[in-house]
Amino acid sequence: MDLSALRVEEVQNVINAMQKILECPICLELIKEPVSTKCDHIFCKFCMLKLLNQKKGPSQCPLCKNDITKRSLQESTRFSQLVEELLKIICAFQLDTGLEYANSYNFAKKENNSPEHLKDEVSIIQSMGYRNRAKRLLQSEPENPSLQETSLSVQLSNLGTVRTLRTKQRIQPQKTSVYIELGSDSSEDTVNKATYCSVGDQELLQITPQGTRDEISLDSAKKAACEFSETDVTNTEHHQPSNNDLNTTEKRAAERHPEKYQGSSVSNLHVEPCGTNTHASSLQHENSSLLLTKDRMNVEKAEFCNKSKQPGLARSQHNRWAGSKETCNDRRTPSTEKKVDLNADPLCERKEWNKQKLPCSENPRDTEDVPWITLNSSIQKVNEWFSRSDELLGSDDSHDGESESNAKVADVLDVLNEVDEYSGSSEKIDLLASDPHEALICKSERVHSKSVESNIEDKIFGKTYRKKASLPNLSHVTENLIIGAFVTEPQIIQERPLTNKLKRKRRPTSGLHPEDFIKKADLAVQKTPEMINQGTNQTEQNGQVMNITNSGHENKTKGDSIQNEKNPNPIESLEKESAFKTKAEPISSSISNMELELNIHNSKAPKKNRLRRKSSTRHIHALELVVSRNLSPPNCTELQIDSCSSSEEIKKKKYNQMPVRHSRNLQLMEGKEPATGAKKSNKPNEQTSKRHDSDTFPELKLTNAPGSFTKCSNTSELKEFVNPSLPREEKEEKLETVKVSNNAEDPKDLMLSGERVLQTERSVESSSISLVPGTDYGTQESISLLEVSTLGKAKTEPNKCVSQCAAFENPKGLIHGCSKDNRNDTEGFKYPLGHEVNHSRETSIEMEESELDAQYLQNTFKVSKRQSFAPFSNPGNAEEECATFSAHSGSLKKQSPKVTFECEQKEENQGKNESNIKPVQTVNITAGFPVVGQKDKPVDNAKCSIKGGSRFCLSSQFRGNETGLITPNKHGLLQNPYRIPPLFPIKSFVKTKCKKNLLEENFEEHSMSPEREMGNENIPSTVSTISRNNIRENVFKEASSSNINEVGSSTNEVGSSINEIGSSDENIQAELGRNRGPKLNAMLRLGVLQPEVYKQSLPGSNCKHPEIKKQEYEEVVQTVNTDFSPYLISDNLEQPMGSSHASQVCSETPDDLLDDGEIKEDTSFAENDIKESSAVFSKSVQKGELSRSPSPFTHTHLAQGYRRGAKKLESSEENLSSEDEELPCFQHLLFGKVNNIPSQSTRHSTVATECLSKNTEENLLSLKNSLNDCSNQVILAKASQEHHLSEETKCSASLFSSQCSELEDLTANTNTQDPFLIGSSKQMRHQSESQGVGLSDKELVSDDEERGTGLEENNQEEQSMDSNLGEAASGCESETSVSEDCSGLSSQSDILTTQQRDTMQHNLIKLQQEMAELEAVLEQHGSQPSNSYPSIISDSSALEDLRNPEQSTSEKAVLTSQKSSEYPISQNPEGLSADKFEVSADSSTSKNKEPGVERSSPSKCPSLDDRWYMHSCSGSLQNRNYPSQEELIKVVDVEEQQLEESGPHDLTETSYLPRQDLEGTPYLESGISLFSDDPESDPSEDRAPESARVGNIPSSTSALKVPQLKVAESAQSPAAAHTTDTAGYNAMEESVSREKPELTASTERVNKRMSMVVSGLTPEEFMLVYKFARKHHITLTNLITEETTHVVMKTDAEFVCERTLKYFLGIAGGKWVVSYFWVTQSIKERKMLNEHDFEVRGDVVNGRNHQGPKRARESQDRKIFRGLEICCYGPFTNMPTDQLEWMVQLCGASVVKELSSFTLGTGVHPIVVVQPDAWTEDNGFHAIGQMCEAPVVTREWVLDSVALYQCQELDTYLIPQIPHSHY
């Protein structure tokens, strides 16, 4: 060294002194996340929190023994800067001196080792692509990479030495030295560490890395932040409250159990490094590699123990390691070294190489060919040497190595290893597949242990090998990732023969050749179990890209032999490394996602592995099938399919579902790889093939998951599997959310930087919607990307989207138009779906779907993570977040649907769900041709769906046919209904996810375009989608009781995003957790909450018209595509994502993104808001959602029906498939709608819900795009309905003709019933459209009666729906109601059919009478002016009402809108649009107009729906007209409030008026609340009563009543609405008041829109109130106005407050002056509590219990200042004079401005009010009496009188006046 030892020592002493100063007194290490106490002592945050958590009582400062509390802790940013600078100094010191700085004083050793290693490694790394790395670093980190490297290296070394060396140097200084030397390189990592927490760091972290990493994270806030999220993501279990906490924990754990923490560290590091750590990673991975070999062994040992502590992981890993060691001892040893290198180097190197790869991804392969060969030879030698050393090392070392490897790679490998452990004969196969993981792990472990044995040799071999391996690996892995991700199995196959082949293959990966796939397929065929296992492992690993590649390679290697394995293992590790690098490089979050997935896999590994092992062969087949499909050789795919059992395939589906996230990760990684390789931009086809590959991989991945799932075929195992799966998915989602959050950030940056553009496109291919939003922020490109992924041709997509739009107008046209580009794919998909040969293509498409879904979900998670931590992201971000959340929740929802179906109708619903989901996925993926695919698919898919083997494809195919097929298949497959249904549910789950995600994608995709058009409109909808999805995710997850654990974890996972929704979700969870019935309830609830889930799951459920569903979705997709309007998309998403409503609250209020808490706080609220918001944000969306909601309820009914009779649904579905074909004639159907009313109505009713949702979307489309879309879609919907209801048409017609008799049938066939009823209602609607309001009302009445009997259940459900919709706001209650209804659906429906049916019938009769009266009134109020439209609305509303109070409302609104669109809109689009526009344009007017619409739609629900529709349409129109986000937000807010208030309230009201009749005023209140514009006033009341109603049979009855009322009202009211909203509203109000004279003041209050102000609250409390207001759609203003209804005061426990201006004005105005506790308690109870109990009783001045506010509120007719003339004279403080004057005016006084203006005369008493202390002149106010004869009093007289609301005597307030001496 140039520096003398003395100088170095001096510097070191200075640094040591500085370090001691900056040491935490508790942990004696550099402070991480410094926090200062009140006594100004600095500690690590984690240490302090640990200290505080240890003691129950007050904790004492360790230094001064003063009491400390968590609140007293304050972050010390300056101190953290000092620590960071110290770390930089240390890094610089290390770089300058070549010494590792730690506690160690072994600088000589370190110097010697480090220079050599640094030289070797640096040279090698440089040769491999160090420049690229630098470029990468420069790209990702604009900072000077060298400096960062240096400083970070020093930091890392320091950190490593500081912590690692302290702990581990003591253990093994040499290792530490090695590590440190490497660590100096890894200083780079440190730099990247914050960004990267790079592999080196990881390894540092793994060795001592946690601490180091933590310090490193301390090093930079970025690191800390990234690491924090990553740690959070990875170490969900470690729950990183702060980096320091986690880091400290991890550091200590790393020391104790480095592996565990290292695993998280690795993930964290991987995520963070993202592309930053290229240089550092290269240096560091070498260093860390060496360290890993030695230190890692220790760390791994500790980590192994730690892992042991990790229950499932520890065991599975331990077993794995043991087994893997035994099985793959020799193989592993080489592989381990590679892996260690890969882990140490690889993570860094992967990143480096990926980075290198990105720039040089294509060239490096050529250059890497030689290195790869060299690497292979060196690997062989090293492997041999390691094998020998491994034997010497023994199990401990090997375990250590294994532990570490496992920590990193084993996360994935654990699962695979578990599979290995659990498989016997298939264990070999599994070992080939899983064992490669194990081999990777074991090999890495062995490498570590061997490295521990001989660090020098390890260093030499490892360094050289790593460098070579890393470099080839990187490019090779890139190939592998690209090809390997797509063609991982072929790669594995090819990898055996030649790495060069792989490289070559990899280059063509972008344009994957059939040969590759065929080879892969052949390999799969040859060693199907092996390959499948490999594929499975690969899939999972692919999820964790490096692992997938590695496992694939390892699998190949194992398959080839140990010798081959040596190369393959290196290849694997390299591939893994490369994959990791690619992933890390493009997206460190991706790595983190992978790692998280790995961790998730690890945590879930035991169960999954067992399952996988058990069904590894079959899974392998499924995997192979998937792979083949994705790969492209249809023949091979077919063979594979044939080889796979249908149940296996189903399992595969299930698995595919599960791995969707992994797939997403893979796809993200693939996207990144394309970004890296820059292949995507150049080769859309390549991308498409890649996407297919990705699809294959996702499927493989899915297959892996299904493999595991399949293995746990037993129900318990399934549950276990499902639970692990869900937790795993949840974790993945959660982690991915966090990671993806990082990724989301990174994607934006990367995408912006162009790195991600490829990735984005690729991601878009797979799941790029989020990424696309990030990149495009809602631009066509994003749509293009989305559709690219959908269609697989990014470049063509924008046009495709357009063509899709056009095509959507004409579904067939869309099919053909969109099919231009898509059709090749679409038809390939569609027909392949239809045909087995094409099945592979379809599979690839479905894989695309799943890939899209997976990546979309991944991106979604990224976005969602981002959403959570960056709620105010730009619109694109918001949309991204929304989409992400949508996708995320979509995933959960998919899980939920499977859960739901597991609970309720696992077999049929799940299958159908799958089918629905898949088609939707296809639709979404196809994004336009999905319509084609789905339309044709149902029939074609029927063919495939018949084939269990095709099941994966079939799921999409099943949409129409899956009901029939799935029912048999399900029954056949469901012979183990619990086992397979979970598989199906999983599949459904995944499919739902995909579908939802795809819909979301489309939504997002289209949302982006509209976003451009509409500004934030899309984003809000996306946000709302996200929110709702979250809610729905949770609800769905919670919904499945068998999957309750799964649900629990999902909920937990979603909980992070949904915790805010958590309150109601928790209720749901609680309910779900309590009983399975509640589970179903939750499911149904979720159906309500998540109509989309239901639609998706229940489209399967509603298998009657899954085709309609499909069409609905297609329409939705079409509509969305056609419109590209966020509303339509919202509708699509919302429809697919019932959660959309809640989301829409968010959507409507991006604040809800911020206020996820709001949504979370009040899921019911969020849901209500969401539904209402959905209505608000996009009226059509909400309508669509409402109609979807109804549809889900219809589906719920169908679900019941499924339970009762799935066959009927099957026939329904068959009808649907045929219907799909007829869909193209929708316009004809539309025109012939009235003619076809009976059959159409039935179908329409079935489709009504779907179609209505579609129609809502369509209406939005028609509003947005044109009436044509609406008509087409209406026609489509109607056609679907007709087709769909064709069978039911008879019933519907019968119902129509003999509603009562059909009622029984409907009752018997609730599932059919609901659609029929819906159909009938729609028929009636149509008929009433044609015939008129009267007929509509009569039919509605009869239909209502029908409903009363047949729909009684449905009505109860509808009531549930209504209440759910209303209670969607109520959330828990709604959920409870829904769950009650749901659980009661099967059992209660029977009860309902008996007891409640009679009650409902009676109520319906009463309702009919009431409706007749209402009709008369409404007709008087102008339903006549626009008879056709009103009748249309009335009919649709009435029919919809009949169908479902809310459902019918939604549908009514939709149909009304549709009909408005079709008729009025088509005829007079301006009228409807104007109406809607008025509603939306007048957000404020919207209240009135909404009421008007309400009124116009006499049925509040219909009117609300109309209103909603109008609102959403007007929102669309308005947004179209006023795309500005502000307007949208205004509309959303106003509409949200008004719609939710009047809308939901209207819905509740109309439907609730009867309910109120039944149940009394509370409902009436809510009804009135609905009636009233003031949703804020009683949304909670609404919801609560609604829930009560839902829970109560009377509520069902009332619901039935409501529909009639609604129908009658809607029949007349729509005309009124169109004619005069005011007249309609008045008529409605009059009729309502007549009907419900019992409406209380509270109801009246609810009728008024609630508006509140707050006084005396802290910002936190204000935010809580704000959330509360948002949830309950209360207007929250800063100033009190005449519209203000509530003044929220900060009070003490006795409701005593300080006197403020708002307090006085509130009392003077007779407002509700309530305590802040009203808000808090309402939030706690998830409903708006009665204000009476929280009214302010007094104030600190006038008395603590003077009851002034109550007196004022109840005495507004007796004004205290009546007859007084008051002149407020002179200056006043604390209160403007005009406010004081307004106050006295409010109290009945007349204000006089001037003293000379007093009126002289009898009966008027003038008073002059002054504030003496405000006068600057001492006696100025004493002379007032000279100017007038009035008494002069102080202002206190006014204030006291107002506060007490009693006119006080003037005597005590009089100011003595100077006598008039001049007289």
Curated annotation (Swiss-Prot):
Result of changing A1641P: In ovarian cancer; uncertain significance
Impact upon substituting R1443G: In BC; benign; functionally neutral in vitro
Top EC category: transferase
Effect in UniProt of substituting L668F: In BC; benign; functionally neutral in vitro
Description of how activity is regulated: The E3 ubiquitin-protein ligase activity is inhibited by phosphorylation by AURKA. Activity is increased by phosphatase treatment.
Effect caused by changing S1715R: In BC; pathogenic
GO CC terms, sorted: BRCA1-A complex; BRCA1-B complex; BRCA1-BARD1 complex; BRCA1-C complex; chromosome; cytoplasm; DNA repair complex; gamma-tubulin ring complex
Reported effect, C1697R: In OC; pathogenic
Consequence the record notes for mutating S186Y: In BC; benign; functionally neutral in vitro
Result after altering V191I: In BC; benign; functionally neutral in vitro
Name this polypeptide is given: Breast cancer type 1 susceptibility protein
Species this chain originates from: Homo sapiens (Human)
